[in-house]
Amino acid sequence: DLVALSGAHTIGQAR
């Protein structure tokens, strides 16, 4: 579940 967490984190961080 690292990919899912990383993806969400990346989007939130980028936003």
UniProtKB/Swiss-Prot annotation:
Belongs to the peroxidase family. Classical plant (class III) peroxidase subfamily. Binds 2 calcium ions per subunit. Binds 1 heme b (iron(II)-protoporphyrin IX) group per subunit. Its cofactor is Ca(2+); heme b. This is Peroxidase 2. GO terms for biological process: hydrogen peroxide catabolic process; response to oxidative stress. Its main location: secreted. The keyword RNA-binding does not apply. GO terms for cellular component: extracellular region. Its EC number is 1.11.1.7. Heme binds at residue 9. Disulfide bonds: none annotated. Keywords: Calcium, Cell wall, Heme, Hydrogen peroxide, Iron, Metal-binding, Oxidoreductase, Peroxidase, Secreted. It is found in: Secreted; Secreted, Cell wall.
